[in-house]
Design a protein with these regions (language model features):
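N- or domain-start disorder-to-order transition segments that initiate the globular core
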Residues: 1-24
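Charge-rich, well-structured scaffold segments of protease-associated domains
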Residues: 4, 8, 66-207
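Residues embedded in well-ordered beta-strands
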Residues: 14-16, 29, 85, 187
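His/Glu-based metal-binding/catalytic segments typifying zinc-dependent metallopeptidases
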Residues: 20, 29-31, 145
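Solvent-exposed coil/turn segments that connect beta secondary-structure elements
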Residues: 20-22, 33-35, 58-59, 91-93, ...
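A cross-taxa feature marking solvent-exposed loop/turn segments within ectodomains of secreted
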Residues: 23-25, 61, 183
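Short acidic, gly/pro-rich beta-turn/loop elements at beta-sheet edges
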Residues: 25-27, 38-40, 96-98, 198-199
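M16/MPP (pitrilysin/insulinase) zinc-metallopeptidase core fold and M16-derived inactive scaffolds
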Residues: 27-89, 155-158
C-alpha cells in the first residue's frame, strides 16, 4: 500500500504527499474539481479551453513552459467531464520552481486577449480535426444527447459546438476562472524525493 500524508491549508487547498527517497525526481499534480459537467449548456467547451489557457502565462510569468524547462521539468494536462488535471515533473532539487509556477497561475492567471485568441484557434482546430473532419467523427457528439437526456454529460469535453468557443468573450473566461480556479476547489499531490515538512514550508510560502 502506498503511504502518504495529508493536510489542508487555511485557504482550503487539500495536499497529499508521498515521500520516496529512492528517486531523484518529484511530481506535482493539481486537480481542479471542474469539468465539462460544470459548463452552461450555451457555453460549452470552457473547461477544455482553460486547460489550454493555463499554459498561456500569468501576470508575473509571460510563459509557463520556459522557467519549467530551464530547471529540467516537463508538464502536461487533461480535461474530462468531472475534473481538470495539471501535472509536472522536475528534478527534486527544483521542486520549489514547480510550487511557484502552479501557485502563480492559480492566483494570477493572465487574461491577455492575445492568449485567448491563440488558444481559441488551437481548440477550434482540435475540435475540427477530431470530430468534424473525420468520417463519422461527430458520432460521439450525436450519441451523448441520446444517452444523457438532461445530465451535462450530454456534451463532449471539447464542447457541444464550435460556436461556443468562437463566441467566448474575455468576460466569459474571467467568470469561469473565478468560479472554479481557487485553492478550495483543488487537490495538490506531491510525490518523489520530498518530505512532508518541506512541502508544507514551500506551499505555505506561495499559497
Amino acid at each position: 500500500m502506498i503511504q502518504f500524508n495529508e493536510f489542508t491549508l487555511d485557504n482550503g487547498l487539500r495536499v497529499i504527499v508521498h515521500e520516496d527517497p529512492t528517486v531523484q525526481i518529484a511530481v506535482l499534480n493539481v486537480l481542479y474539481d471542474v469539468g465539462s459537467r460544470d459548463e452552461r449548456p450555451d457555453k460549452t467547451g470552457f473547461a477544455h479551453l482553460f486547460e489550454h489557457l493555463m499554459f498561456g502565462g500569468s501576470i508575473n510569468i509571460p510563459s509557463y513552459d520556459e522557467p519549467l524547462q530551464k530547471v529540467g521539468g516537463e508538464n502536461n494536462a487533461f480535461t474530462n467531464t468531472d475534473i481538470t488535471n495539471y501535472y509536472l515533473t522536475v528534478p527534486a532539487a527544483n521542486i520549489e520552481t514547480g510550487f511557484w509556477l502552479e501557485s502563480d497561475r492559480m492566483l494570477s492567471l493572465s487574461f491577455d486577449p492575445q492568449v485567448l485568441e491563440v488558444q481559441r484557434k488551437v481548440v477550434i482546430e482540435e475540435f475540427k480535426q477530431r470530430y468534424l473532419n473525420q468520417p463519422y467523427g461527430d458520432v460521439w457528439l450525436r450519441l451523448r444527447p441520446l444517452t444523457y437526456l438532461k445530465h451535462p454529460y450530454q456534451w463532449a469535453t471539447i464542447g457541444k459546438e464550435v460556436s461556443h468557443i468562437e463566441n467566448a468573450t474575455p468576460e466569459d473566461v474571467r467568470d469561469f476562472f473565478f468560479r472554479f480556479y481557487a485553492p478550495n476547489n483543488a487537490i495538490m499531490v506531491v510525490a518523489g524525493n520530498v518530505t512532508t515538512e518541506q512541502v508544507k514550508k514551500l506551499i505555505t510560502e506561495v499559497l
